[in-house]
């Protein structure tokens, strides 16, 4: 069997690595992939851009691909799933209409309101003056979001009124995020603990993945600007069995039923970014129509089920007939980033110290890497993700940092506290 995975990040490396464990899979093509996927057994990079829909369809036809898994959001929002389905090619992901859950923050907030799904109070604006009047009336802290896709960076958590006003002017006048900023959503600042709750959906049935928690801020103790994510761990102890049930009943099921009732049944990975308050009430911060990055890396380390079989079951609308199995151990992934990220950063720096031999329960997933004249070099802001399993989050953290310590390039940095909330909980016990 041949599989195609669309994307080039750490998430796609992890999905490809996991999919390769299926004994019936002979080749997994990754378009376009990275230096790490190129080295992986059974994986083969294909130089097709993630947004080249016609090229991807033609390739999948030519190679008789039996399953395509979409990693990033951009191809979903421009309709890759619709194009594959029209060509009769099996693909796991939401249609262009369903992908609005991630593609438009305003669509999502209005959808949540229509279906009484808990989220923060909000308003949408396209003009500066009314937006400024609204934040002055609401006060800070307050959250300002660019409406469209901004690679996870179009969200400003403004702790002062001045920051909120600057963000609004940037997004609407300066258009800091290209087209994405031509409308802003301003919403209430939610206090609590964040969790990433990712499920597989087949249009009707839902199969939860392991819980996880991402670390969005670039600096230790959650300081500095937001990024695409600096590290993650799984499971997230904030999601107790009781809170897990509440999330399914109050957020996930109403979302899946709501999308179906509006004529956009949802198939694919659905990621709810949640804030869980001190009473255990989950509120939706955002939806993503795909697996999170870097959450995928620790989650795939823990997955004992067969990813390919689960995706095929979802395409056949049979998710109610399968279950997911997980390693009871904790897993943690630490992102190694290029100096300057999430602003301007260097590319082309040679990476040294990558492990030559893989040890059970440890894996370095590649993201922004490239092969140049036999060297593996940096090619993005988030370059690698050092991931490890452990009997506790503390043990997984220790192993992951030991792994990260072996690797270096000019300007490399990482956070030093990934998993700190879960470790504090472990120490309380």
UniProtKB/Swiss-Prot annotation:
Region feature (Disordered): 212-235
Biological source species: Vibrio parahaemolyticus serotype O3:K6 (strain RIMD 2210633)
Pathway: Purine metabolism; IMP biosynthesis via de novo pathway; N(1)-(5-phospho-D-ribosyl)glycinamide from 5-phospho-alpha-D-ribose 1-diphosphate: step 2/2
Presence of the UniProt keyword Protein transport in the record: no
Cofactor note: Binds 1 Mg(2+) or Mn(2+) ion per subunit.
UniProt-recorded name of the protein: Phosphoribosylamine--glycine ligase
The gene coding this protein: purD
Residue ranges of every copy of the ATP-grasp domain listed in the record: 109-316
GO molecular function: ATP binding; metal ion binding; phosphoribosylamine-glycine ligase activity
Positions with a binding annotation for Mg(2+): 286, 288
Known cofactor(s): Mg(2+); Mn(2+)
